[in-house]
């Protein structure tokens, strides 16, 4: 079972990726983790990636595809894998197809921008423990204080409204075209494309995924 997850930051992909990995026993392949692992292992591709990154440049699509191909031959990918954060663009999706990396399911998590802003901007964190609260959906007992320690809660830099809106604009410009790309692929019988309503409770979304994936 080979799966691609699509959706804006804050659409709930991370939570559902965890559910899919545990239920179906397939690994999540994150391009960032893969690059770091290749560099650390000192493989041929890792050396190339390190040179590019050390020069402050972006790693090419060709190199990332080569890394994905190498990664999915490993034993833990025998029953499939989950791609999150890749492909991000049409050229990357085309390159994957040309490299013979076929995908069974493309799952799009659909959440309106305003709800995403609401979800992310309302997050409050207790940095020492990693506990996460939300001013509206999961408030602490005392406003601005951690339940267990009474210490102050903070807002992550990435969770500020301006940053969130900027990331959403980038997502719509770069990644949203993949939605029509994979819809066409599905119409041609090359994959199954499903749009998931990500505004519902986590358990409801997980239940729908279990029905889709079988």
Swiss-Prot record:
Residues 30-59 are annotated as: NMP. It is an enzyme of class 2 (transferase). Residues 122-159 are annotated as: LID. Its EC number is 2.7.4.3. Pfam families: ADK, ADK_lid. AMP binds at residues 31, 36, 57-59, 85-88, 92, 156, 167. GO terms for biological process: AMP salvage. Coiled coil: none annotated. GO terms for cellular component: cytoplasm. ATP binds at residues 10-15, 123, 132-133, 200. Keywords: ATP-binding, Cytoplasm, Kinase, Nucleotide biosynthesis, Nucleotide-binding, Transferase. Monomer. Consists of three domains, a large central CORE domain and two small peripheral domains, NMPbind and LID, which undergo movements during catalysis. The LID domain closes over the site of phosphoryl transfer upon ATP binding. Assembling and dissambling the active center during each catalytic cycle provides an effective means to prevent ATP hydrolysis. Catalyzes the reversible transfer of the terminal phosphate group between ATP and AMP. Plays an important role in cellular energy homeostasis and in adenine nucleotide metabolism. This is Adenylate kinase. It comes from Serratia proteamaculans (strain 568). The gene is adk.
